[in-house]
From Swiss-Prot:
It comes from the Eukaryota. It comes from Bos taurus. Heterohexamer of two PFD-alpha type and four PFD-beta type subunits. Component of the PAQosome complex which is responsible for the biogenesis of several protein complexes and which consists of R2TP complex members RUVBL1, RUVBL2, RPAP3 and PIH1D1, URI complex members PFDN2, PFDN6, PDRG1, UXT and URI1 as well as ASDURF, POLR2E and DNAAF10/WDR92. Interacts with URI1; the interaction is phosphorylation-dependent and occurs in a growth-dependent manner. This is Prefoldin subunit 2. GO terms for molecular function: protein folding chaperone; unfolded protein binding. PANTHER family: PREFOLDIN SUBUNIT 2.
Amino acid sequence: MAENGGRAGKSSGSGTGKGAVSAEQVIAGFNRLRQEQRGLASKAAELEMELNEHSLVIDTLKEVDETRKCYRMVGGVLVERTVKEVLPALENNKEQIQKIIETLTQQLQAKGKELNEFREKHNIRLMGEDEKPAAKENSEGAGAKASSAGVLVS
């Protein structure tokens, strides 16, 4: 995908007008948006797992004596602390992770809207996608959409 994006970027400066966008450029832009969306979803899933781990550790440490020794990884170094020192830091980290997940979820929704708008603007259909919804859209807005050729993305 990165190779296609590189070639599409080079061909855009070679002499085509700004109004005309080739099918390769549309596909490269669409794939770039999909990749960004996947990256956001992946990061959100990773943080969800980390949040679950924090919750598990916090629940476990709440049942333990506050003076008991525990170990915490700080900057790649294992540090010996007490439960009383570690628990507030873990709870703070958990809150921060929750805020980041909320932000990522909002970004993911915005990216999804942007991707759908891009699909509609360039009449992009994915391989394996049903033709029935597309046929219904064409019958309703035949004047605007009949003139533009669709782009098929695998």
